[in-house]
Curated annotation (Swiss-Prot):
Heterotetramer consisting of two non-identical subunits: a beta subunit (TrpG) and a large alpha subunit (TrpE). Its EC number is 4.1.3.27. It is an enzyme of class 4 (lyase). InterPro entries: Anth_synth/Amidotransfase, Class_I_gatase-like, GATASE, TrpG/PapA_dom. This is Anthranilate synthase component 2. Keywords: Amino-acid biosynthesis, Aromatic amino acid biosynthesis, Glutamine amidotransferase, Lyase, Plasmid, Tryptophan biosynthesis. The keyword Lyase applies. One of its GO terms (biological process) is L-tryptophan biosynthetic process.
Length: 200
């Protein structure tokens, strides 16, 4: 079980994600991105080994309330998982570049290629995933690796040192055939931040 604080970017997928995480026996707190950073940060500090999760949402990362500033405040100290808009915000907060995909993907299933490591270990290759987005990551930040693609589009990234990862696709969608398994692996991978820190 993990202690997860989910930042809600006011999206219809948020509570699908909450339900999936709670079904996996995780403790989940939800705050909207309109809540002040101080309140959210104080809640994170009260949790044992917290994970910050950033939900999907509309628009651009810079228009998503406190999200970018919150990432910058906790990165390196608290593991972060971003989905769709949350993924884009992680890339931007760490210095990467986000741009338009050239077309809108709304409820589209695509077959992605992945590296078969960490959260993708033991899942099919290629992997069917759900996509709802018009933005993509054009340039990844330093210390991040690309761990999945659709054609030439970046579909996910991870930073093994900070235990920060982002997914352009939706693991919580029924169109992502192994989404529940992937989400469990994501939470396990993020939680290793605290085990690694103890050894240092």
């Amino acid at each position: 079980m993990a202690n997860i604080l989910l930042l809600d970017n006011i999206d219809s997928f948020t509570y699908n994600l909450v339900e999936q995480l709670r079904n996996q026996k995780n403790n989940v707190l939800v705050y909207r991105n309109t809540v002040s950073i101080d309140i959210i940060f104080n809640s994170l500090k009260k949790l044992t080994h917290p994970i910050l999760m950033l939900s999907p949402g509309p628009s651009l990362p810079k228009h998503a309330g406190c999200m970018l500033d919150l990432i910058k405040k906790v990165k390196g100290d608290i593991p972060i998982v971003g989905i769709c808009l949350g993924h884009q915000a992680i890339v931007e907060a760490y210095g990467g570049i986000i741009g338009y995909a050239g077309e809108i993907f709304h409820g589209k299933a695509s077959l992605i290629r992945h590296d078969g490591l960490e959260m993708f270990e033991g899942v099919p290759q290629p992997l069917p995933v759900a996509r709802y987005h018009s933005l993509i990551c054009n340039k990844i930040p330093e210390k991040f690796v690309i761990n999945s693609y659709f054609e030439k589009m970046i579909m996910s990234v991870r930073n093994n040192c900070d235990r920060v990862c982002g997914f352009q696709f939706h693991p919580e969608s029924i169109l992502t055939t192994h989404g529940d398994q992937i989400l469990e692996k994501i939470i396990h991978w993020a939680s290793l931040k605290y085990i690694t820190n103890k050894k240092q």
